[in-house]
């Protein structure tokens, strides 16, 4: 049997991307309506607005000499479906996701939510990075720090 890297212990990062659609309103209950409007602008519209988010999840670890993989991408897809798609896709984040009842649904906080959910389903220690695209120009990277 051949091993990864000719017998060396090789580390690698593996990423998978998915997309989900969700609506939300940027609004802090600690601020007045006027302050929210000043801070969040049109994103504080009382009727909300939506995004087609893209998420890139990166895991890391040693390349298994028997399989040649850090993680089977089919398994990563299942974990992402459970941790991201089921709770977030086609949802109003503020109304349908209990986490956001007390947390402003900024892209930063959505990335933290995704990280926390993935940590619950992935093997311990493999999650490396969550990269969340709210738009092509607005991107948040979260590494659990």
Swiss-Prot record:
Protein name, entry field: 6-pyruvoyl tetrahydrobiopterin synthase
Organism: Pongo abelii (Sumatran orangutan)
Residues modified as Phosphoserine: 19, 28
Metabolic or biological pathway, per its Swiss-Prot or TrEMBL entry: Cofactor biosynthesis; tetrahydrobiopterin biosynthesis; tetrahydrobiopterin from 7,8-dihydroneopterin triphosphate: step 1/3
Cofactor note: Binds 1 zinc ion per subunit.
Misc. comment: The active site is at the interface between 2 subunits. The proton acceptor Cys is on one subunit, and the charge relay system is on the other subunit.
Coiled coil: none
Binding locations of Zn(2+): 24, 49, 51
GO cellular component: cytosol; mitochondrion
Phosphotyrosine: modified positions: 128
EC category: lyase
């Amino acid at each position: 049997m051949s091993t990864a890297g000719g017998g060396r212990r090789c580390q690698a990062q593996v990423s998978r991307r998915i997309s989900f659609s969700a609506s939300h309103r940027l609004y802090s209950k600690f601020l007045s309506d006027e302050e929210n409007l000043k801070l969040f602008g049109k994103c504080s519209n009382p009727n909300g607005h939506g995004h087609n988010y893209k998420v890139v999840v990166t895991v890391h670890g040693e390349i298994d000499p028997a399989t040649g993989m850090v993680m089977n991408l089919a398994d990563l897809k299942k974990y992402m479906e459970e941790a991201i798609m089921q709770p977030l896709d086609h949802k109003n984040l503020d109304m349908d996701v209990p986490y956001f009842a007390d947390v402003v649904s900024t892209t930063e906080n959505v990335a933290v939510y995704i990280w926390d959910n993935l940590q619950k389903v992935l093997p311990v220690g493999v999650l490396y990075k969550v990269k969340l695209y709210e738009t092509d120009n607005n991107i948040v990277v979260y590494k659990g720090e």
